[in-house]
Amino acid sequence: MPQTILPISVGQMVLICIFILIILFVITKAKGIKGSWSKKSEIDPFINHSLSFYVPEEDELKDSEGERICRKFLRETVGVLFKDRDGNPEPFNKARPDFLKNPVTSGKNGNFNLEIDCYSPKLKLGVEYNGAQHYKFIPHFHKNKEAFRNQQYRDELKRRMCNDNNVTLIEVPYTVKDIPTYLYNKLKPLGYLNSLQ
């Protein structure tokens, strides 16, 4: 008489896999096995051994598309022209430099400096992508008209403080369709792109 094989459900298959993983975990702990599955010599060529390199922060994943385009352009053009001693390009990370202390918020519960979307302290260059909320009242961003006026005040304060500290601040309005060309046309006369052909 032929034997019948009972089908295994997906749930049962998942439980079997989990059980096998638990057994493997217990065996490796009991034997005192530590480390990874690969030998160092096999993965070593893929490891960046320099002391400084760029790691995207979690907040960067939340940046607007315009801000990401600005940062990508800056890193791939200006950043590669101005490298650190290890040959890493200037990263143009988001920053809250000390010279951008907001007199309204800096005294409350810690440090609330104004932020620059893409900033290089070495080059004294900042790029700010300004969404529509910087130019008009948008309920999603502003709870009332006063919040919108505060936004405009902070924008003007940032411009003045950058100017007072000899930091070039380039603002990219949300209406710009070709951000790389816009930035190129702003940066070229300032001498940041002189080495580019």
UniProtKB/Swiss-Prot annotation:
For whether the record's keyword set contains Transmembrane, the answer is yes
Question: How does this protein lie in the membrane?
Answer: Single-pass membrane protein
Q: Where are the transmembrane segments?
A: 7-27
Question: Where is it predominantly found?
Answer: membrane
The species this protein belongs to is Invertebrate iridescent virus 6 (IIV-6)
Q: Which family does it belong to?
A: Belongs to the IIV-6 307L family.
Location comes to:
Membrane
UniProt keyword terms in alphabetical order: Membrane, Transmembrane, Transmembrane helix
Look up the record and report any one GO term of the cellular component aspect: membrane
Mind giving the lineage of the organism this protein is from?
Viruses, Varidnaviria, Bamfordvirae, Nucleocytoviricota, Megaviricetes
- Please state what the protein is called: Uncharacterized protein 307L
